[in-house]
Amino acid sequence: MEYKLPMKVKPPVKKDGDIIFHIDVKLVNKADEIALGLQYICNRYLYGQGYRKLMGDFFDKMGLHSGTLIKPFIISSHVIPQMSFPGDIDFLIIPYENDQLILSKALVIELKIIRAKFIKQQKSPNEYGFSQAKGLIESGFPYVAVMHLIISDESPQSHWRDVLIAKVVDAKSGKIELIETIKKDMMPISLMERGFGRLVHNCPDERIGLLATYFAQEKAGNWLPCGKEAKFNDKCTVGILDKIAEYYYQNYTTFLDTRKYPPIKKD
């Protein structure tokens, strides 16, 4: 199924250094779900890696003039009036290409924050988010995913591992040069792999995409996420896609435009 409509209107372009969201500092300090979710979609590299995991081949085939329109934390009934569960949609993501909304590839994500600690790495989450994801499937969204965004403290340095640092000599051939060995806290990798394994084991529906992402607060660098591609929901209808489009047309200024490629600079 492929269903597209004209974009008609575009949100304002947010460039590097622009203010995208104003977040209450109290929410940031307590690592609230909304604060972390907003910070996550502002990290365009990390967001893009997660989107690629969830949408697979579709992402790889997106062209030069393509991207995604992201709307965080929506009251569900504002999109589908008769919808009551879940009460909100954490992320609504509409891809576009060449000024066309690709509505049949719209993705909704149920977000859960996993607060891990070194001394309790084995602890399972109280909720996985699958009941909400099943509600999103029943409501007819074309693609549905559950995302666990993981935060943690650091491991004691005695538990850090040796890792190699390399530099790229030739990007085309893939040739690298090993530089040195350093000590690195690799707990984020363990947390993501363990968290993803739990998601896979507990997932009740193969249509639900799965994503385990580590979010490094106030630290440099990103960790590549673990994920499984979402599958098309056969309960999706053109009527639902039209409602998604109508919501975008009425609220487009509140969406974040994240392009797949940087804009082409004109001479």
Residue ranges and their predicted role:
Residues A116-G129, S155-P156:
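Active-site-adjacent loop/helix micro-motif of nuclease/hydrolase catalytic cores
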Residues R52-S76, K175-D185, K219-K228:
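Surface-exposed intrinsically disordered loops and tails
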Residues I179-D267:
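Charged, low-complexity C-terminal accessory regions
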Residues G56-L107:
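Active-site metal-binding core of divalent-cation-utilizing nuclease and nuclease-like domains
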Residues F91-I93, K105-F118, L136:
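Conserved catalytic cores of phosphodiester-cleaving nucleases, focusing on short active-site segments
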Residues N29-G37, S84-D88, P125:
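Phosphate/oxyanion-binding active-site loops and adjacent basic polyanion-contact surfaces
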Residues M1-L64, E229-D267:
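Charged, often low-complexity linker/regulatory segments
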Residues P125, K134-E218:
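Nucleic-acid nuclease catalytic cores
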